[in-house]
């Protein structure tokens, strides 16, 4: 009550923040006449003067903000024929301060972004603008690029599909770079797999503006970015598990109100938490079907995991809702946008389980080579900002996870859209009939209608019903997303009826003419409440842009997933009490609030899941940053590894004596010299005379082994000059580091999969995960030291005479081959070629010629062997 009175007197915190910005807007507006009088050239000169002051650090960005915003607005009027409204200036200031600007649909977020983008690009450190798809990235870069270029700033765009380093480097070196969230994230991961600093494409993380920030930082937060490679694991287990899963029967959980009650069936599905529990009866049945004694023995761990995933595939994942089958492949449908996620796969074997379920080719499992999350990627930026039409419902998460404050920007013109109460029916059939009747009424008077659905399946049901009713319409879902912009652009035409999944063309405005305005504007009909209120608000926001009239209403049923799982008991009781007959609906603010409470429950569950994911990834992220920082040190051309290699030899020798138990029972003279020498030969390819090691104390033995290895190593390296030696050491060391990191990620995946079971032992899984992951990381560090010594010792370089002889023989062979017919029948692979042996093209050639690799053995044509 007190807080309510306080708000009425002083306004909300958001109102007070906006008032502060309004004062500054007046100052910017006062500068407008000054800049209007300037010629184009004078504007450019003034901009360059301000830019020089920023580069020389004579002024801060905040000190010149008024001038820059006024200048940019004037330039926009001349170049784009668009003038920034006062509320757009407020939006620009919010973004510049590293906050989220919540701006309604049609308020011109793309134009708003130009203000902070240009201001921050003046430092020359680069600005990234992130969008949800390639179409919007290209469109915005092209349209706004005219303004940027007018002021002498360069702009480029990162698109999916092309991985040419030089093209991407040029794009990132531009003052302003547009692209999608996934491309920025994957480029970061790929950069940390490079073997030369000059091959990296990104140049740092200075300032980023994330468009549709709720979609990227909230909806996509549970989706890790993973670069993976193939494994050699068999796929038969997925087929066996699928066959067994089909023979198990779904049951019901024990009744908590009945003591002694037991679950029925072979497994229980918890739709609320999206988990499956196999009952004791189910375990026994599965063991018989698999032909094993104990399904949960360590030797059957993979089999039990496959069964869990097969049961999830059959009971929690629905075709045309969670995925589609396209061209013989299972393709994920993004639950928040309704778009197909081409190239993305479910992890932990779930995707293979879905492929087995659908009877399509099962693609091999992959192994993680590099990974991160959007949460940790975007938190690397010195300044992070975002804009969207719907952020307030997730303000707590933005604050806790990203330290981002949400500011709601007033609309330029008041919203005239009428949002009606929900209509709730008992069954889906009744609901869909009511929707068709309502669409028919609107269509007959010419009012355009956009019908929103939660899945492809529902959109196709409505499509068939509208077809039977003889109502012409368009359908927009993941199966025909290529026409997305075209279909959405026509949705506001008189008499248009459009069915759309959640994708609903974000970023594409639905414009209406005066005739449609007189008919009441665009009519939004939602056929199901989404788990997130934001998605519903986005659908509503398609109507009523920039003061246009419009209307929205949701049609629900007790059979809808949200109400069925989270909240229908209370609503059903109300409907029964009111005596609602078949075909009748209930419309009540109380019921609408009950639905919103159900949504809040789900949002809370999802928030906890994302927070949980981040807590675990924060552990991995610290390790990731350590490894990537070390990699960067190795890539530095001035970094000399000699001291590090010498230390590692001592570590290797110490570890060798300790793990091989050369000293028995603490007796220093009782060790097996022959065994020790054979281990060193196997590890390092170095033969050591036993007499050199006899009679030595422990410390002397460590020192002697390290010394012998150093002498032998220096002998091999003598055929190379200093620069070549450094390059070879770095390349080989990086290969060892990457292999060790890859193995570490695999071990971390295994650890994460089973760590939840520690909770049954009254231990905090997160604390246990931190302990275990630290131990694994220390093992990685130890393995890196010893494996690097082995790799560097075992490498052999050919002498100049051997190289020349091999080159002569290969040249003769190639000349003979020119006179022989080509044989395409025997298409064997070069089994010796592996990515690890790839030499960077600009590195000195290891042959000792002094030339770059690309100008020597890296040339096309006959290649000389480098590693003997």
Curated annotation (Swiss-Prot):
Residues 816-827 have a biased composition (Polar residues). It is a peripheral membrane protein. Its cofactor is Zn(2+). Zn(2+) binds at residues 845, 847, 856-857. The keyword Zinc applies. May bind 1 zinc ion per subunit. GO terms for biological process: intracellular protein transmembrane transport; protein import; protein targeting; protein transport by the Sec complex. Residues 816-868 are annotated as: Disordered. Keywords: ATP-binding, Cell inner membrane, Cell membrane, Cytoplasm, Membrane, Metal-binding, Nucleotide-binding, Protein transport, Translocase, Translocation, Transport, Zinc. Its main location: membrane. ATP binds at residues 88, 106-110, 509. Its EC number is 7.4.2.8. The keyword Cell cycle does not apply. Belongs to the SecA family. Monomer and homodimer. Part of the essential Sec protein translocation apparatus which comprises SecA, SecYEG and auxiliary proteins SecDF-YajC and YidC. Part of the Sec protein translocase complex. Interacts with the SecYEG preprotein conducting channel. Has a central role in coupling the hydrolysis of ATP to the transfer of proteins into and across the cell membrane, serving as an ATP-driven molecular motor driving the stepwise translocation of polypeptide chains across the membrane. NCBIfam families: PRK09200.1, PRK12904.1, secA. This is Protein translocase subunit SecA. It comes from Campylobacter concisus (strain 13826).
């Amino acid at each position: 009550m007190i807080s309510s009175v306080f708000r009425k007197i002083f306004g909300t915190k958001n109102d007070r923040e906006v008032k502060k910005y309004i004062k500054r807007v007046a100052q910017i507006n006062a500068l407008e006449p000054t800049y209007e009088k300037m010629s184009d050239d004078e504007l450019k000169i003034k901009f360059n003067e301000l830019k020089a002051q920023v580069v020389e650090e004579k002024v801060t960005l905040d000190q010149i903000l008024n001038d820059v915003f006024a200048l940019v607005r004037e330039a926009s009027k001349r170049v784009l024929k668009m003038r920034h409204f006062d509320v757009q200036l407020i939006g620009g200031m919010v973004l510049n301060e590293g906050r989220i600007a919540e701006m309604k649909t049609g308020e011109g977020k793309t134009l708003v972004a130009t203000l902070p983008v240009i201001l921050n690009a003046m430092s020359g450190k680069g600005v990234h603008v992130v969008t949800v798809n390639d179409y919007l990235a290209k469109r915005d870069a092209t349209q706004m690029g005219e303004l940027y270029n007018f002021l002498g700033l360069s702009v480029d765009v990162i698109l999916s599909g092309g991985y040419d380093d030089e093209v991407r480097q040029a794009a990132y070196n531009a003052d302003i770079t547009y692209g999608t969230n996934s491309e920025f994230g994957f480029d970061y991961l790929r950069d940390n797999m490079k073997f030369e600093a000059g091959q990296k494409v990104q140049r740092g993380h200075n300032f980023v503006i994330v468009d549709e920030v709720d979609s990227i930082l909230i909806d996509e937060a549970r989706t890790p970015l993973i670069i993976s490679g193939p494994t050699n694991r068999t796929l038969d287990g997925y087929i066996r598990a699928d066959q067994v899963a089909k023979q198990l029967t779904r049951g019901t959980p024990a009744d908590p109100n009945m003591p002694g009650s037991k679950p029925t069936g072979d497994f229980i599905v918890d739709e609320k938490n999206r988990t499956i529990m196999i009952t004791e009866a189910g375990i026994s049945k599965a063991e018989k079907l698999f032909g094993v004694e104990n399904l949960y023995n360590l030797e059957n761990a993979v089999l039990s995991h496959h069964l869990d995933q097969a049961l999830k595939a059959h009971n929690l994942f629905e075709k045309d809702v969670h995925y589609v089958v396209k061209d013989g492949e299972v393709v994920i449908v993004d639950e928040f946008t309704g778009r197909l996620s081409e190239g993305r796969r479910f992890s932990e074997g779930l995707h293979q389980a879905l492929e087995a379920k659908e009877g399509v080719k099962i693609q091999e499992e992959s192994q993680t080579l590099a990974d991160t999350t959007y949460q940790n990627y975007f938190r690397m930026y010195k300044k992070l900002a975002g804009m969207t039409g719907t952020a307030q419902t997730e303000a707590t998460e933005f604050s806790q996870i990203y330290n981002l404050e949400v500011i709601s920007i007033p609309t330029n013109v008041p919203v005239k859209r009428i949002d009606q109460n929900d209509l709730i029916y008992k069954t889906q059939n009744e609901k869909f009939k009511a929707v068709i009747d309502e669409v028919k009424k609107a269509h007959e008077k010419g009012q355009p209608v956009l019908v929103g659905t939660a899945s492809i399946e529902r959109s196709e049901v409505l499509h068939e019903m509208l077809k039977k009713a003889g109502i012409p319409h368009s359908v927009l879902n993941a199966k025909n997303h290529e026409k997305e912009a075209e279909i959405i652009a026509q949705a506001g035409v008189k008499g248009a009826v459009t069915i759309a999944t959640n994708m609903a063309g974000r970023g594409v405005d639905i414009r209406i003419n005066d005739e449609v305005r007189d008919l009441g504007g665009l009519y939004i009909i939602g056929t199901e409440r989404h788990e997130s209120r934001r998605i519903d608000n986005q659908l509503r926001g398609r109507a009523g842009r920039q003061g246009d009239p419009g209307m929205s209403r949701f049609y629900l049923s007790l059979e809808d997933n949200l109400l069925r799982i989270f909240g229908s008991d209370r609503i059903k009781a109300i409907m029964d009490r009111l005596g609602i007959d078949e075909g009748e609906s209930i419309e009540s603010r109380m019921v609408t609030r009950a639905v919103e409470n159900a949504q809040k429950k789900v949002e809370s569950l999802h928030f906890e899941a994302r927070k949980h994911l981040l807590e675990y990834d924060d552990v991995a992220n610290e390790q990731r940053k350590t490894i990537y920082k070390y990699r960067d040190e190795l890539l530095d051309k001035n970094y000399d590894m000699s001291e590090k290699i010498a230390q590692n030899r001592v570590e290797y020798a110490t570890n060798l004596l300790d793990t091989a138990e050369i000293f028995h029972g603490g007796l220093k003279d009782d060790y097996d010299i022959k065994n020790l020498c054979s281990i060193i030969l196997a590890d390092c390819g170095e033969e050591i005379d036993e007499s050199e090691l006899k009679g030595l104390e422990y410390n002397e033995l460590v020192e002697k082994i390290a010394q012998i290895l150093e002498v032998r190593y220096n002998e091999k390296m003598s055929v190379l000059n200093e620069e070549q030696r450094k390059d070879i050491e770095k390349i080989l060391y990086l290969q060892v580091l990457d292999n060790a990191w890859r193995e570490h990620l695999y071990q971390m995946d295994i650890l994460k999969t089973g760590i939840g079971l520690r909770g049954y032992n009254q231990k905090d899984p997160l604390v246990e995960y931190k302990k275990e992951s630290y131990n694994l990381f220390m093992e990685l560090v130890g393995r890196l030291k010893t494996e690097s010594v082995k790799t560097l010792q075992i490498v052999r370089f050919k002498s100049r005479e051997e190289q020349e002889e091999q080159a002569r023989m290969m040249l003769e062979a190639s000349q003979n081959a020119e006179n022989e017919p080509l044989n395409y029948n025997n298409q064997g692979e070069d089994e010796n070629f592996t990515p690890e042996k790839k030499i960077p093209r600009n590195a000195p050639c290891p042959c000792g010629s002094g030339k770059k690799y690309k100008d020597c053995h890296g040339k096309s044509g006959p290649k000389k062997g480098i590693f003997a």
